[in-house]
């Protein structure tokens, strides 16, 4: 497997958007992610209420969408899962992410409500040999996962064992 570049920059509220642009350059984003493919942005909503450092912040979503639009990406899907503890629609609202999507003419898509299809294991051996279900929206798409560095309630117990 080809090694990919990793980039880290110190940022500030004043330089955040230009820093994200620079990070994409350092990570050779344009060599890897292409505007002529469907692009899925995997948003991270850990809790439906707003807790700083817990979910995708609006400025991160805004910065990546700004860069995608600048690069003429058209087919963009902003998605998140439905979980037993999180209502993603409420989370999109309380975390101010809907406002960002509206700014770029996009809407939120809940993966649980979209179509699903069977993935043949010969397509991706990482997951084992049995068939797996996958959201239809990610078939043939490039996925950008918006990372959130955080602790989880299980981490203390898991790391202590």
Region locations from a protein language model:
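N-terminal and secondary-structure boundary signal
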Residues: 1-161
């Amino acid at each position: 497997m080809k090694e990919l570049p990793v980039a880290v920059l110190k940022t500030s509220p004043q330089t955040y958007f230009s820093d994200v642009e620079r990070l994409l350059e350092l990570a050779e984003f344009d060599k890897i992610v292409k505007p002529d493919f469907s692009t899925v942005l995997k948003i991270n909503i850990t809790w439906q209420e707003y807790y700083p450092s817990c979910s995708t912040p609006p400025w991160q979503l805004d910065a990546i969408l700004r860069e995608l639009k600048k690069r003429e990406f058209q087919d963009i899907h902003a998605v998140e899962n439905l979980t037993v503890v999180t209502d993603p629609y409420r989370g999109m609202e309380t975390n101010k992410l809907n406002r960002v999507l509206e700014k770029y003419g996009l809407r939120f898509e809940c993966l649980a409500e979209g179509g699903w299809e069977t993935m043949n294991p010969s397509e991706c051996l990482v997951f084992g040999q049995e068939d797996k279900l996958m959201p239809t929206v990610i078939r043939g798409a490039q996925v950008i996962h918006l990372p959130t560095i955080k602790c989880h309630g299980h981490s203390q117990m898991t790391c202590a064992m």
